[in-house]
Curated annotation (Swiss-Prot):
Protein name: 1,4-alpha-glucan branching enzyme GlgB
GO molecular function: 1,4-alpha-glucan branching enzyme activity; cation binding; hydrolase activity, hydrolyzing O-glycosyl compounds
GN (gene name): glgB
Function statement: Catalyzes the formation of the alpha-1,6-glucosidic linkages in glycogen by scission of a 1,4-alpha-linked oligosaccharide from growing alpha-1,4-glucan chains and the subsequent attachment of the oligosaccharide to the alpha-1,6 position.
EC code(s) of this entry: 2.4.1.18
Signal peptide: none
Protein keywords: Carbohydrate metabolism, Glycogen biosynthesis, Glycogen metabolism, Glycosyltransferase, Transferase
Protein family (similarity comment): Belongs to the glycosyl hydrolase 13 family. GlgB subfamily.
Organism: Nitrosomonas eutropha (strain DSM 101675 / C91 / Nm57)
GO cellular component, one term: cytosol
Enzyme class: transferase
Location of the active site: D415, E468
Subunit relationships: Monomer.
Length: 732
């Protein structure tokens, strides 16, 4: 941003009151006392340097000694007009070392009134350019501009090693009535640790806070922010970004590998892979396995590993656990060059109570609601954002914008949307407050989500948004101009719950629960659904996918193969959590890598091979993905064979090509099974989950399958096939 015109020298307010407030670290307007001031006969320069024994001021006549007017470290000089900005020569009291530096109070503020206005209105979508820290030039001098929002503060200071963490030394300038504080500190190198010391105006409480807009933090358990280093990363993903802008994602295959960076793989000593190492190892694996995207569990900075990243303290920073921001850029860039999209799990629903971060940031409920019935999440022990506060809206929208813009992220998965939409979410009667109409809908959250999706789709062509929404809220993935929330897709939690419940049943009981396989088609096209088998289903005693399956060991693996066949052929885009693809035996453990040694065993290698083949079949076959969101892409052949627990359906592409899917959910091989077909021609089996390659019994249908000439199940013809046990087959 361009500097504002330098203000005229202020009237000297060097009374006892201002001096006392400075020394007590309570001075609200440091520019009224420090810096240059007009006095009779010229100008006065006043600095506060409590750790210096002597101070000189550079004038047109050279360096002049400044008079120490208070033994706490106040130095003054009076004379004719001083050239701005002016340089100070400082002698350290402890060491005698002499250094030269510019006075922060010799520089004008830089943030424009227009940006402050937009921020206060909730319409500043790139607030990260204004707030936080930035390496800038001010009056030709390079330095760091600090800016933070703390409207209920009496005083805000930048503190760090460079000023002995002394809140008296670098108090910030209050920017009118915006609640924003700003200070330019010259010659501060990138990578310098800092925090904000905030004194509440009403209570006098002093808080030490990290920067909400910082782009980098020190490694946990420490939590100071770091001043930025100029990024020199040169992106090489232009082809991907151009292609994405014209991407017809509604009709394209979307097959997502959900991954936690810290527990996918680790070094033998248990240390994390860096972002660069992850790129080098993960990308070839994703390509081999046939995934179109990788979705990262939250990599925004967070203090607690066991939160999986869902208790965020740094909404603009890639966690330093795995490297610096440029290293994460490298990861995204390499994914794009390999044709892999990158989706981030993003958490605008709540934030942790950690005292160093957003919670009661300036001594008041700033980012959260004051009333715990609105502002406290009982299940997670976290605070809920106040979406009705304009500056909070600017903060969250800017966070989303930052990841999509600066890091070229291809999509955001918004966590816990249901908890945002309902004021009574997980609350008993009397524990929540209704909206202004007396209802339980969070109107502010609804507006925020619509603005979020409007921004993403309007400014980042081809970028996607995913809602993890577990209720029947209507039109989650419908455009905002039609009254929807505007998400690209919604997680189909109903399909996931029904399917996993069904797969855990003993096959002898499954025919009583046949509707759990068929009910999904009654609502499958009310939203743009994605079918998840996610991290939430393999933790907290829920068991791994393999352990959920019923039967003996052979049947458990057969059931898992059948589950993946059903998922990959059912309408909807796909997402699978890491480890699912090779039948991880244990629940996911965040502090350990996956059990890769299982791939030494044939059944696990078989699952991996099956899912690899299914993934590539899905990517390469228009009938399995082009019409995922449209009724024309799916039709039942027979959904009524509950007695034998068999379902059959066809998937179609826009050009009319189709595939037939027949699934047998019992361990009984069925010979002579008649299936209706839409065309009187020969068919071939192109996939069989019971293949010996996958660990099955190799029962199937080799060669041509000839129609019988008999109509069946409302189809023009039929075929006679053999159905393998606990398996699915695909015919073309």
């Amino acid at each position: 941003m361009k500097s504002l015109p330098f203000p005229s020298p202020s009237r000297d307010l060097a009374g006892d009151s201002a001096q006392s407030l400075l020394l007590a670290a309570r001075l609200h307007a440091p520019g009224s006392y420090l810096g240059i001031h007009s006095v009779p006969g010229g100008e006065l320069v006043r600095v506060f340097q409590p750790y210096m024994s002597r101070v000189w001021l550079q004038t047109s006549s050279g360096f002049q000694v400044m008079e120490c007017t208070h033994d706490a470290g106040i130095f003054e000089w009076k004379g004719e007009a001083v050239t701005r900005p002016y340089l100070l020569r400082l002698e350290h009291a402890e060491t005698g070392v002499i250094e030269e530096r510019y006075d922060p109070y010799a520089f004008p503020v830089q943030i424009s009134g227009h940006d402050l206005y937009l921020f206060n209105e909730g319409r500043l979508l790139q607030a990260y350019h204004m707030l936080g820290t930035h390496q800038v030039k001010n009056q030709g001098v390079t330095g760091t501009r600090f800016a933070v929002w703390a409207p209920n503060a009496e005083r805000v200071s930048v503190v760090g090693d460079f000023n002995h963490w002394d809140g008296r030394v670098c108090p910030m300038m209050a920017r009118d009535h915006s609640g924003v504080w700003e200070l330019f500190i010259p010659d501060l190198p990138g990578g310098t640790l800092y925090k904000y010391e905030i004194r509440n105006h009403s209570t006098g409480e002093i808080l030490l806070k990290t920067d909400p807009y910082a782009t980098r933090y020190e490694l946990r358990p420490n939590n100071a922010a770091l001043t930025p280093v100029e990024s020199r990363y040169e992106w090489q993903d232009n082809d991907w970004m151009v292609q994405r802008a014209g991407w017809d994602w509604l009709h394209a295959p979307v097959n997502i590998y959900e991954l936690h960076v810290g527990s996918w793989k680790r070094h033998p000593d248990g240390s994390f892979y860096s972002y660069q190492e992850l790129a080098d190892h993960l990308i070839p694996y994703l390509q081999e396995m046939g995934y179109s995207h990788v979705e990262l569990l939250p990599i925004s900075e967070h203090p607690l590993d066991e939160s999986w990243g869902y208790q965020v303290t740094g909404y603009f920073a890639a966690t330093s656990r795995y490297g610096n921001p440029e290293a994460f850029m490298y990861f995204v860039d390499k994914c794009h060059q390999a044709g892999i999209g990158v989706i981030l799990d993003w958490v605008p629903a709540h934030f942790p109570q950690d005292s160093f971060s957003l919670a009661r940031f300036d001594g008041t409920a700033l980012y959260e609601h004051e009333d715990p019935r609105l502002g406290y999440h009982q299940d997670w022990g976290t605070y809920i954002f106040n979406y009705g506060r304009s500056e909070v809206k600017s903060f969250l929208l800017s966070s989303a914008h930052y990841w999509l813009s600066v890091f070229h992220i291809d999509g955001l998965r918004v966590d816990a949307v249901a908890s945002m939409l309902y004021l009574d979410y997980s609350r008993k009667e009397g524990e929540w407050l209704p909206n202004r109409f007396g209802g339980r809908e969070n109107l502010d959250a609804i507006d925020f989500l619509r603005e979020l999706n409007t921004m993403v789709h309007g400014e980042f062509s081809g970028a996607l948004t995913f809602a993890e929404e577990s209720t029947s809220w209507p039109a989650v993935s419908r455009p905002t101009y039609l009254g929807g929330l505007g998400f690209s897709m919604k997680w189909n939690m109903g399909w996931m719950n029904d399917t996993l419940n069904y797969m855990q049943l003993d096959p002898i009981h499954r025919h009583y629960h046949h509707n759990e396989l068929t009910f999904n088609q009654l609502y499958a096209y009310t939203e743009n659904f994605i079918l998840p088998l996610s991290h939430d289903e393999v933790v907290h005693g829920k068991k791994s996918l393999l352990d959920k399956m019923s039967g003996d060991v052979w049947q458990m693996f057969a059931n898992l193969r059948l589950l993946f066949t059903y998922q990959m052929t059912c309408p909807g885009k796909k997402i699978n959590f890491m480890g699912n693809e090779f039948a991880q035996g244990r629940e996911w453990r965040v502090n350990h890598e996956l059990d890769w040694y299982l791939l030494e065993r044939d059944p696990h290698r078989g699952i991996q091979m099956l899912l690899r083949n299914l993934n590539h079949l899905y990517l390469d076959t228009p009938a399995l993905h082009e019409l995922d969101f449209f009724t024309e892409g799916f039709s039942w052949i027979d959904c009524h064979d509950s007695e034998q627990s068999v379902i059959s359906y066809q998937r179609r592409a826009r050009d009319g090509s189709f595939m037939l899917v027949i699934l047998n959910f019992t361990p009984v091989p069925r010979t002579g099974y008649r299936v209706g077909v839409p065309e009187s021609r020969t068919y071939q089996e192109v996939f069989n989950s019971d293949s010996t390659y996958y660990g099955g019994s190799n029962i199937g249908n080799p060669g041509d399958i000839v129609p019988t000439g008999q109509q069946w199940s409302g189809q023009v013809d039929s075929i006679i096939i053999t159905l393998p046990p606990l398996a699915g087959i695909i015919l073309i």
